[in-house]
Amino acid sequence: MYESKNSVYCYKGTNVLVNKMNIKDPIALKNYETSVIGLKLMALSKQGITGKFDVSHFVSIHKFLFEDIYPFAGLFRTENIAKDYFQFAEWEYIESELIRLLSELKSENFLANLTKEKFAERLSYYWAELNVLHPFREGNGRTTREFLRQLSLKNGYVLNLHKVSPQKLLNASIKSIIDTADLEKYLYACLEKWSHYFYL
């Protein structure tokens, strides 16, 4: 749960995000969110690559995933948030920093023609940077993972995160703020060439 006193995104006096179904029980909201997002991610997996790996692409993924749940879907947060005493990027700099980061990705030719080792290294870098940015009030991890899944697909890889336990990935993601080595190792293990995956 994010730390943000008197959040404009929550029902007054609670940590429950204002949602389109007006669900005020946090467990019920989490369960509803999980079921909806599962279907949305499945739909995206059938669509292939849905953008040009720019800001618009990243934002559109968040909007698609969360538009049936939260009114802020596809909108950058307008308050600062923290988790476990770590404060994510200040909201005023989100858009400019995301533009800078994805321009850097473009300058790297979207990681084309890299060895698997180098691809995993650069993928872990972008995962870590997007994590620090945390552009949205909720749904950052799922948006980032889908964005990087599509980036992997563009480069001929299937990014199968089910190969590593969610807890290991979470711990590596947290640690990636200062060291991406574990995240890089896990992402390498999760990457398979599309042709090999297809014929299994």
Regions picked out by a protein language model, each given a short descriptive name:
Residues 1-200:
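FIC/Doc superfamily catalytic core
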